[in-house]
C-alpha cells in the first residue's frame, strides 16, 4: 500500500481532476466543490466523460461540473424528461460517448442537444432499473435484479439479455469473466458466474462469503474483492489467493472498502471513513 489520500469532512467533496503533477507520484491536483456550488455531501459515484465534464451522482440528484460551475439535474414531477429519481447508483459513458445514469426508478440516457434525458423501457413498456454496468466491445451491459440487459451499438437498442433465477440477486458490480460469462457481485448474496447464453449460474473458484461491498477485474485480469469489513483480496482466475490487505498487515486505512478504480496501473481504494488508498 503506497499512498493514502485523506478525505475532508462531508461539507465538501474532493474530485481528482485529470492533471497529474510530474514532480512526485503522490502529488495530485485537487479541486474542491463545496455546498456553496450546490453539491450535496452524499456523493455516491463520479464519472469524468470524454469532453472533460465531471458527472457526480448523489442521493439527491445528479451534478455536471465543467471546471467552473456545477449544473444540477433532479426529478421534476411536471417534467417528463427529467430524471426518474434523485437517488443515483452509477454513471457510465459507453464507447459512443452516451452518458447513462442509473437511478432508483430506472436508467436514463442523457441527451446533449436538449440537455435532458430519455428512458429505455422493457418489452412491457416499463422502465429498466439497473445498479451496475460493464463495457463490452459491441455495447454496454447493465446489471439489474436477476437480470442482465444489453445496449447494442448496432441498432441502438436496450434489451433483456439474460434472466437467471438467483433469489433476488441484485447485481451491484459486474465484469466479464470470459466471452460468454459474467462475474456478478451482490451486496448480500455474494458472487456468481452467469452464463450469458443459458442463464445458468454457479459460484466462482473462490469464496469470500455472502457480504461483498465491491468487486472489480483489473487490466491484468486479476479479481479484486472486498468482503464487508474484511479488507481487500486479490484472486487469479483459477481461484488462487494472490494477495490480501487489511489494517492488520498493510497501510490500508479501513477494513471496509466501498469502491475500487484503476488508473495508470494503480488501484484506487475508497474506504468507509478512511479516505482513499492507492496501491
What are these regions (language model features)?
Residues 1-279:
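Carboxylate-rich, polar loop motifs that coordinate divalent cations or form catalytic acidic clusters
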Amino acid at each position: 500500500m503506497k499512498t493514502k489520500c485523506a478525505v475532508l469532512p462531508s461539507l465538501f467533496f474532493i474530485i481528482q481532476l485529470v492533471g497529474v503533477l510530474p514532480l512526485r507520484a503522490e502529488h495530485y491536483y485537487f479541486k474542491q466543490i463545496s455546498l456553496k456550488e450546490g453539491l450535496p455531501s452524499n456523493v455516491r459515484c463520479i464519472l469524468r466523460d470524454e469532453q472533460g465534464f465531471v458527472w457526480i451522482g448523489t442521493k439527491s440528484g445528479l451534478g455536471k461540473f465543467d471546471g467552473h460551475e456545477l449544473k444540477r439535474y433532479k426529478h421534476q414531477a411536471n417534467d417528463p424528461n427529467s430524471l426518474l429519481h434523485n437517488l443515483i447508483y452509477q454513471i457510465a459513458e459507453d464507447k459512443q460517448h452516451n452518458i447513462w445514469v442509473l437511478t432508483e426508478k430506472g436508467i436514463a440516457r442523457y441527451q446533449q442537444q436538449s440537455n435532458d434525458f430519455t428512458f429505455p423501457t422493457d418489452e412491457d413498456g416499463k422502465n429498466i432499473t439497473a445498479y451496475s454496468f460493464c463495457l463490452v466491445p459491441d455495447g454496454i451491459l447493465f446489471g439489474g435484479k436477476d437480470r442482465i440487459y444489453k445496449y447494442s451499438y448496432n441498432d441502438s437498442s436496450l434489451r433483456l439479455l439474460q434472466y437467471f433465477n438467483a433469489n433476488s440477486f441484485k447485481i451491484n458490480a459486474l465484469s466479464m469473466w470470459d466471452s460468454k460469462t459474467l462475474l456478478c457481485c451482490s451486496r448480500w448474496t455474494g458472487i456468481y458466474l452467469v452464463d450469458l447464453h443459458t442463464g445458468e449460474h454457479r459460484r466462482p473458484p473462490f469464496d469470500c462469503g455472502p457480504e461483498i461491498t465491491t468487486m472489480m477485474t483489473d487490466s491484468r485480469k486479476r479479481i479484486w474483492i472486498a468482503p464487508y469489513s474484511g479488507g481487500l483480496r486479490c484472486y487469479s482466475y483459477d481461484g488462487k489467493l494472490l494477495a490480501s490487505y487489511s489494517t492488520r498487515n498493510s497501510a490500508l486505512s479501513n477494513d471496509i472498502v466501498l469502491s475500487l478504480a484503476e488508473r495508470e496501473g494503480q488501484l484506487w481504494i475508497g474506504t468507509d471513513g478512511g479516505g482513499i488508498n492507492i496501491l
